A protein has these predicted regions:
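Short N-proximal segments of mature Sec-exported proteins
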Residues: 19-72
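Compact alpha-helical subdomains of small soluble proteins
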Residues: 51-110
Length: 110
């Protein structure tokens, strides 16, 4: 997890909040959320987990974003898309294998 990663989110629909930069803990939370969401969808698509497990993982993603990332939902979603587009699929799955437990400890949801 690169806690120093900086993410800029541009929202052309709302020029007042046109750019949002996340860094430090918030950037790390975004990366964790992306990792969990992508892994959930991928595993479910390969029939390695069921829909219920996928929904739990996606729910954890939402809670991480709600509790550990500031800004509007639109800003968070835009930043999450940037993280997704900057990370390769294999790198994201490797992140999951190495860092999932640490993410959940670093960004508790309960």
């Amino acid at each position: 997890m690169a806690a120093a990663a900086v993410l800029a989110a541009s929202l052309s629909a709302h020029p007042v909040s046109a750019a949002r930069t996340y860094e430090g803990e918030e950037a790390a939370a975004l990366r964790c959320a992306n990792m969990l969401a992508l892994t959930a969808v991928t595993l479910a698509g390969a029939d390695l987990i069921g829909d219920q497990e996928k929904e739990v993982m996606l729910g954890v993603t939402v809670l991480i974003l709600e509790r550990h990332v500031s800004g509007t939902w639109r800003q968070k979603k835009a930043a999450l898309e940037i993280v997704r587009d900057r990370r390769s699929f294999p790198d994201t799955l490797d992140d999951y294998r190495r860092n999932a437990a640490r993410c959940l400890a670093q960004f508790p949801i309960n």
